[in-house]
């Protein structure tokens, strides 16, 4: 018996080795099999699981010199021409443990950065995964300068081109091709997801689009607007991070328990309309460490108010309350916001010397009138996507410090009004989940671990993983009624302190008891 067991083990080992060799051989042969128009293969390599992959060609500003890879995969890197004067850098990661699903990742900010962490995440879940650099390298908007083709890549063409090429490569590499196609992105990646919904409705069966940067031109102007409110760090209207903490604590004091629980988390920011007069320093007060001046209180009120244009029309909704501490060092730091500066200098005015400290709503009007390649991405008629059978799931953190979650609520309302559909009808193809305690795409004070990436992973169960929830919706017809978030005790990957079910909009979470606020069953969507 011992001899038979040994022979059996050897046979199994040989079969596994043969399987491994077959996969590696197939990977090595891929480079010479690619004969696609405008596609220039740079290299193909087999990458074993457990590798910390060096990324020497990744722009330093992208902030990733390496990426941990959890699964055996075949990596193909290429350049794809998008016009006579533009091209994208594209990578496809084909995992050994393939599930028959194709997925495209997105990007962030103004960046030309392949999001390798998303490639690793999706490939690790068995998706044939592609990611592109948006038509330029690095996080600056300078490559847009006098290069409209690069702007077009950024606006819509990069992701779509990557999808077209990626699907062809997937069919070339895997004998069975793919059965369903998906998208996963956040921020600019969220906007790209909705651009696919609006412009390329047949590209994906299921789209997960987080914190979308749609209403893009007005978002850029809104981000520029904050400097006009705060002024420089010597202005009387400026608040230091410590002062923003004072404001935040008062906002939480006024709004925390509106959901029924005192847990430091605002579950429904729509109910929160704080009055900051309560923390204005008294005349002649000697101790001003825990209060604000009248000018500073006005700044907070202005930040928490919508931005209107030259003719009084709404351009962008308010920053939702509760994000003050996280936004202080980014949006209200006494300096113009760099993405806004770059967009105005290199796209709107094509003038690298444009003075970003002089921005006004007249500039916002000029930018919106330009709207190159409809980068606004705010078309509310998504009937073609619905007709194609597509599903879109969007989420937005209610502590988002860079893109107001109120903008996602505005778009939801515009879709409902334009398509003349109540939430019960929208639910068939478009579901929106505000996530309390989540900052921009991940992180925050609450249960933000929804499985939208490596930094928020809490298992593959569809109830705990927003991407797998989309897979279940597309492939089994089971739509998510909630998305469960995990509150990590010490950050991503640490012990889960508690979980919370985040409600499908327009429902909101209310604490009913009788358990502690950490008990997800003590909450109810109403």
UniProtKB/Swiss-Prot annotation:
Glycosylation sites (chain numbering): 137, 233, 311, 516
Disulfide bond annotation, renumbered to this chain: 27-74, 62-113, 186-441, 255-272, 281-291, 503-525
Gene behind the chain: faeB
Signal peptide boundaries: 1-18
GO biological process, one term: xylan catabolic process
Residues forming the catalytic site: 187 (acyl-ester intermediate), 400 (charge relay system), 440 (charge relay system)
UniProt family annotation: Belongs to the tannase family.
Binding site for Ca(2+): 256, 259, 261, 263, 265
Function: Involved in degradation of plant cell walls. Hydrolyzes the feruloyl-arabinose ester bond in arabinoxylans as well as the feruloyl-galactose and feruloyl-arabinose ester bonds in pectin.
Name under which the protein is recorded: Probable feruloyl esterase B
EC number annotated for this UniProt entry: 3.1.1.73
GO terms assigned for molecular function: feruloyl esterase activity; metal ion binding
Subcellular location per the Swiss-Prot or TrEMBL entry: Secreted
Reaction equation(s) it catalyzes: feruloyl-polysaccharide + H2O = ferulate + polysaccharide
Keywords assigned: Calcium, Carbohydrate metabolism, Disulfide bond, Glycoprotein, Hydrolase, Metal-binding, Polysaccharide degradation, Secreted, Serine esterase, Signal, Xylan degradation
GO CC, alphabetical: extracellular region
Organism ancestry: Eukaryota, Fungi, Dikarya, Ascomycota, Pezizomycotina
